[in-house]
Amino acid sequence: MGVSNRLAWGCPTKEHLLPHFLEHLGNNHLDIGVGTGFYLTHVPESSLISLMDLNEASLNAASTRAGESKIKHKISHDVFEPYPAALHGQFDSISMSYLLHCLPGNISTKSCVIRNAAQALTDDGTLYGATILGDGVVHNSFGQKLMRIYNQKGIFSNTKDSEEGLTHILSEHFENVKTKVQGTVVMFSASGKK
């Protein structure tokens, strides 16, 4: 992750992505698309963390890496589907770090993912994360190669994803939307759910 973030995407983890993650972290947090659990190793011990991923192995690996004592719930769920009612209005913060560019479809088809997450936030909660853009940014040769390979293999689905498109789908569900592009990555936060 560190090598590709720095060299391919131009958005070093420790300088940009980790501070963004920690800045928006609430006391009762849901991490969606948990990956390796890297960010969770940096959360304060007092935080209540829940994990959501469709992949049980990822849930277990992230939970182990973060420390089981920090994990409140492990939720196996498809983010394109509405969340169980028990999750509605539960979380102060929800993160989607490098989730959106891995989901199938164009950016507009991912609007339901934002809507579903918004329902799980408290009224003053924040949805935030980062995603790799395919449109409106200039990829270096390493980034171009990875984009081509990952999109061909179906690991990514982001060739047309743009900051403008992301802002649009976030604004459909939130009053306050902020984005910042670093390299070919857009970091975002959204609050004031509609």
From Swiss-Prot:
Any one GO MF term held by the record is: methyltransferase activity
According to the lineage, what is the superkingdom?
Bacteria
Tell me more from the record: Encoded by the cryptic lambdoid prophage DLP12.
Tell me the protein's name. Putative uncharacterized protein YbcY
